[in-house]
Regions:
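Catalytic active-site module of serine/aspartate enzymes centered on a nucleophile-bearing elbow/loop
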Residues: 299-300, 307-338
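Conserved acidic catalytic loop of the alpha/beta-hydrolase fold
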Residues: 98-100, 104, 111-131
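Alpha/beta-hydrolase-fold enzymes
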Residues: 152-154, 158-242
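N-terminal cap/lid subdomain of alpha/beta-hydrolase-fold enzymes
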Residues: 28-95
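Acidic catalytic loop of the alpha/beta-hydrolase fold
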Residues: 242, 259-263, 288-293
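Short alpha-helix in the alpha/beta-hydrolase fold that links the catalytic acid
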Residues: 267-271, 280, 291-303
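Short beta-strand/loop motif that positions the catalytic acidic residue
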Residues: 278, 284-286
Length: 338
């Protein structure tokens, strides 16, 4: 897929207050541009993923000749606001200072990102999105977008996601925030390397939520001769050291806050009332061992949208199942392709 940057001409107002005049959205598309009448598949990514599903997070499903065929469809994925992966956020340059915004960047909500996505859609001249797929945090965007722009989407897939942040998820975000703030270099923000040790700790907390005991700890059990368990700790140190090469602590704080803003029912009479207004053909896919969006949450959620269907994939990989169980996802997704 090809990388693009959309630069919005005008002031962008944020839901929680503040504005910027230099909004940018990084996005990837199929090599062939959009033309009227071409079938459109729009993917919404997870928390720290980027806008290149073919190259990074869903290569088994997206690409030339793959299920989501980039030569057949106009496939697009845009990066959320606040991210470290290209779209406007705290790591972006503040034109008034010539330095990153850091904490001067307005706080971002799910609704802000969805409004930005819709600006991009209009800029590209897309009147209908035949298939919208939201994975994890991307599902937050999909719920919000479907409610605010009913009639635009043909079919929607909500995968390993929720319509409102739960205390369980918000609690992990609170712990991650505490880890970031415990690093004294985080508040100094002399450069984007501030808060790196805190970011490693925050990411380790998040990793706990992405797998379940069977999928993570049983693969990292120490031998019976080991005095102090260390295998899983070594795994965490390796994963977090890789992560901080691509992410900064400030952007991570902002996307965690964005997750905490997720509530499609806010100001709309609650989640049930909001979802009842969705007009699209909706499918829910849940990972059986997902501890962030478990079956006991996703199945009742699916019942709130008239005519929706629910599928559960049996997996030992927890929330990360949506990245790993691509064959099972493909079997459910294939009949819905435009």
């Amino acid at each position: 897929m090809i990388k693009h940057i959309y630069k919005h001409n005008g002031t962008f107002e944020f839901e929680a207050g503040g504005s910027i005049d230099n909004l940018e959205i990084t996005y990837h598309t199929s090599p062939l541009g959009y033309t009227r009448g071409r079938k459109v598949i729009w993917l919404c990514h997870a928390l720290t993923a980027d806008s290149d599903p073919e190259g990074t997070w869903w290569p088994a499903l997206v690409g030339p000749g793959k299920l989501i065929d980039t030569e057949k469809y106009f496939v697009i994925c845009a990066n959320v606001l606040g991210s470290a992966c290209g779209s406007s956020g705290p790591a972006s340059m503040n034109p008034k200072t010539g330095k990153p915004y850091y904490f001067e960047f307005p706080r971002v909500t799910v609704r802000d990102t969805v409004r930005a996505f819709d600006l991009l859609r209009q800029h590209l001249g897309i009147e209908k999105i035949d298939l919208l797929i939201g994975t994890s945090m991307g599902g937050f965007m999909s719920f919000e977008w479907a409610v605010t722009r009913p009639g635009i989407f043909g079919k929607i897939f909500f995968i390993a996601t929720g319509a409102r942040v739960t205390p369980w998820l918000a609690g992990f975000n609170a712990a991650s925030r505490m880890a970031l703030l415990a690093d004294p270099t985080f508040k100094e923000h002399r450069d984007l390397n501030g808060g790196m040790e805190g970011l490693k700790a925050a990411r380790a907390i998040a990793l706990l939520t992405y797998r379940c005991e069977e999928g993570l700890f049983k693969q990292n059990e120490d031998s019976d001769d080991t005095v102090f368990a260390g295998k899983v700790g070594s795994y965490y140190r390796h994963q977090t050291s890789k992560f901080v090469k691509d992410w900064d602590a400030y952007s991570y704080l902002y996307v965690c806050d964005e997750v905490d803003s997720n509530n499609v029912g806010r100001g709309r009479g609650g989640v049930a009332k909001a979802l009842s207004e969705i007009e699209s053909d909706c499918t829910f896919i849940c990972m059986s061992s997902d501890e962030l969006f478990p079956p006991e949450d996703m199945k009742p959620l699916s019942a709130l949208i008239p005519g929706s269907s629910y599928h559960q994939i049996e997996t030992p990989y927890g929330h990360d199942g949506f990245l790993i169980e691509t064959s099972a996802i493909a079997d459910i997704l294939r009949p819905a392709l435009p």
